[in-house]
């Protein structure tokens, strides 16, 4: 029951919940009267959100109000134009500062339009949310009055159908909220309330990031090459990047500059960064140089601990893709390409197939939380062992392999039951502290005295502390996996909602390692959305030593971003299938040559960037964020 001011109405029924919308000075008296009239009902005060709401809430709680509903507008803003998270944070903070927070239930509404908004509102300080316009959307309303009438205006509206639609929406949101709680290691939503230390605020991170750049420039002033229009691709991989990447994969030559080859069509990330020299250069004039005249190699062991001084010939290697997420021909092609390029490729978390033994010197094998396919024998034959603590596309969640991809050979390698969906737990149940982390690293070092250790983590707000902790635990490589990384199967709410973008994380970690005096004792690798030679160069300029690539290699083979990787026969090109017949669509011999060709084109482009700045080694580019501009 919503009451707008007084006096209280005479009812023939007893409401369960009464909300009073009235001037703040009259609310306590009205609420007291309502409590006497309906003693079994929950009585709440309704307040519009503005800069004074926090103090008003404090006053109401001191005067006995125990439920407060604060409201934003339909686009999740308060009356002053602030977005809902900031407004909620202020109200919650005002109550906490006066030691009153646990004396009141705080309800929030206004523009809550997705499950992620529920989790974020609670993390900012709400106890629960109230839904408004999203209910109309659930019933099929477009929210555009000039487009079509709302189904609820129909005199034949089926109430049971409408109720079931709301139940369906609530169930879907509940499942997504459970994913968030699981990712944060929580079992009760009450623990999420006010957990702002685990939130990432765009304005804060963006301001810190831009301080490290050389300058900014208008986006419209960026001299982009022609951009094609076609249905293939997506915002991060638009058709022009697919086209130029696959052109390099066919020819082994750098792009000709007639089609855009450096940036995609997203509204952030590396698409909003440019090197200073690009701004006054004809995009058709692609800067290239012979990479033979530059030192492109990357040392992986900088600790001087007596283990092999691993060095790869290019500043990147292949990301983890398990047998199960992709088929064997793709695994073969990626490992063969790594051998030809003098770099590495990771098996992912599904085990190390014996058929790849011929590439043993160029393989990273991964130890993830499910321990699928992990054995002493496989650990002892890999030069690099990677502990996968988290993945950028689904931070806080273990790996997923759906049952239709768990074929007989996959199940045999993973020592699992064929046809069942496989979910790696989170976290490692033997690692709950930095000390446990060190024991984990020591276990791998003891198992393989010749291997160097990589630690793969996602990018939470305290990623700099995580990186330093990994260094002191004994890691040689710190692998930061950002939120734009590819994934075959991850909950939608986990993608881009839990961790920060890789371009924010890299300089944050790089500078913290510098301040700790240990930057030159560890190799920092970046992954998660790096698509082009320019992305790699930008990541290095931000502070990474090198990059780790996954999706780009699949695009070189023929991926056009259909985004059905999680399905057994979903990929029309057989790239992400484990079906033995469907996998024959991939020619392993042709595919490894295409990956090598793409990387050859990249080397010429990166050499051109180095030449433009008078550098002779890729290591000279590291940390030169002053050479980057923010495109705004």
Predicted regions and their residues:
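Glycine-rich phosphate/ribose-binding loops and adjacent secondary-structure elements
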Residues: 3-4, 9, 15-167, 183, ...
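Mobile "lid/hinge" segments at catalytic clefts and subdomain interfaces of large enzymes
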Residues: 125, 135-137, 143-148, 152, ...
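Conserved divalent-metal-coordinating catalytic cores
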Residues: 58, 154-183, 187-190, 202-203, ...
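Intrinsically disordered, low-complexity partner-recruitment/activation regions
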Residues: 12-13, 380
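Glycine-rich phosphate/pyrophosphate-binding loop
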Residues: 413-416, 422-429
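Short boundary motifs at domain starts and secondary-structure transition points
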Residues: 10, 35, 306-310
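Conserved, well-structured core domains of diverse proteins
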Residues: 1, 182, 187, 191-409, ...
